[in-house]
Amino acid sequence: AAAALVILPNTSASVAYAMSQVPVLSRLVEVVTFRDYHYEDDRNSADIQVPEVTVAPDTDADTQKSSAVSEQTKKTAEEINTEIQTITDRLIAEFEESKANEEGYQNMTVKSEILATTDQYFTLKLICFQSAGSGAEWNYYYTIDLSTGKRLQLADLFQEGSDYLTTISDNIKQQMKEQMAADENKIYWLDSDTPEWDFTSITDNTSFYLNQNNEVVVCFNEGDVAPMSMGCPEFVIPNEVLAGIRK
């Protein structure tokens, strides 16, 4: 027999149970579960956990700047939450439509992970997986600059006028070549027989985050720069590569 459980938006912090064990990694920002959608029958299964970024009350209101950063962080968190809810609402609607049409077997999972977070940056990763015959995974990254409260853009990390896109892209190409030379099972679309598929350059919209070593980590989804079997590749750009152009 089919069984479905839908937990509606939380009205109390105590209801935010699924991520309540995650420690607060910054004094300002934390994550709770906004909604938990679960469904399972003989042909369909879904486990969709919708995270929500929350901002702690500003306890350091001694300065006008602190209050302004707190308000900006709240605004940024609201924007991120709206984007996440739009994504997950769409995925739930697609799942339910496919289920209603009895289109075969399907599985959908959405979860989140707090990535390496420092005193200055907070990053939430939304992980989506969908399978119906074959499977696909794709991710979204949300980084808040805790010193400004704004969502961090790649350009924010570099000196004005610097060609950071080329510098990062060249290093990624070098890493791709080194990985393929060391492991025949590693395949990237680089100098291939189908040049139109080859990786040429990242853009300002390419996903990234900063790890605990303050290194830029560039993230691709399945099929972006390699066959789907390679998963979602990530490339850590060494600090020394960007030393001359980072702010």
Locate the predicted segments by residue.
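Compositionally biased intrinsically disordered regions enriched in Thr/Gly
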Residues: L8-K247
